[in-house]
Amino acid sequence: RQKQFIGNASHEMQTPLAVCRNRLEMLVDDAPTLTEEQLGEIAKVQRTLDYLVRLNRSLLLLSKIDNGQFPETEAVDMNALVRRTAEDMEEIYAYRNMRFTLADEGPLTVRMNPSLAGSVVANLVKNAFVHGDAGGEIVVTVASRRLTVANSGAGGPLDAGHIFDRFYQGAKKEGSTGLGLAVVDAVCRLYGLKVAYSHTDGRHCFTVDFPA
């Protein structure tokens, strides 16, 4: 019942959030009549609203996964998917002087919903970026039956027993919804995949094992 409520609420919030974003954009279009202080306040509201939009999208996605609303499957080339994701985030990595390395150790093709496959890769890579060190490194390894995302990061290991919980606070940073790894876990459960976390030599590592 709780999951159903969250799903319904997330669906209903889409339109009001979109309306708010449009109205803010209209205000910005009137920038010549606004002071710098007013523009600064609008920018703060926009950042908060962007966060709420991301949060709502994640909640809606989790609700759809829970309700089995992704029945369509096809053969997904994970090697190509990882390359596209890396290219999409290239400028973001450069902003923090982070190095991205793709280790292509073998072809990995899996049968699953392509949108959900994209969510797994994107959320793992974004998690590595958010929790990685500026000037650090992210290494994504694609092998015949395994996807690994590792990053250098300050601090010790995360709480492996709760890191995939929804709204887990221990790993949450400013701007993060706290739902990315929960989405990864939900998709893996849906397809019977194994996702695990480890911490070795100052590196956080997430692995997803695919059945033969």
Residue ranges and their predicted role:
Residues V28-L39:
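Short acidic helix/loop segment immediately C-terminal to the autophosphorylated histidine
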Residues K44-L52:
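Short alpha-helical segment of the dimerization/phosphotransfer core of two-component systems
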